[in-house]
Amino acid sequence: MAQVEYRGTGRRKNSVARVRLVPGEGNITVNGKDVREYLPFESLILDLNQPFEVTETKGNYDVLVNVHGGGFTGQAQAIRHGIARALLEADPEYRSSLKRAGLLTRDPRMKERKKPGLKKARRSPQFSKR
């Protein structure tokens, strides 16, 4: 018999997370490692669990994540976005609570590109009067 699983893709900055939810005890595995081993800060782990708290499904699903690109914060928020989308696939009734918490919206903020003649996106070279 095929095991039930729900999939969701989350994105944030340059990070892309492919999330699979499987009925289980609430274990979160990111790129083959436990989430506490993979993410260095407790605040990121709390951020990542937000969709489960909003839908009151904490401990109902095991989460298997494949994430790449970006840094820790972008990856954690991409995982959060993916979990929210996968939960929506599991039960469409979660939509209103997830939407109210802002978990279904892809954060559009990206790094601004570097412009020619400047050191960074907006930082200009040091000005010398003489």
UniProtKB/Swiss-Prot annotation:
Keywords: Ribonucleoprotein, Ribosomal protein. Residues 111-130 have a biased composition (Basic residues). One of its GO terms (molecular function) is RNA binding. Residues 98-130 are annotated as: Disordered. Coiled coil: none annotated. The keyword Ribosomal protein applies. GO terms for cellular component: cytosolic small ribosomal subunit. One of its GO terms (biological process) is translation. The keyword Chloroplast does not apply. Belongs to the universal ribosomal protein uS9 family. This is Small ribosomal subunit protein uS9. It comes from Staphylococcus carnosus (strain TM300).
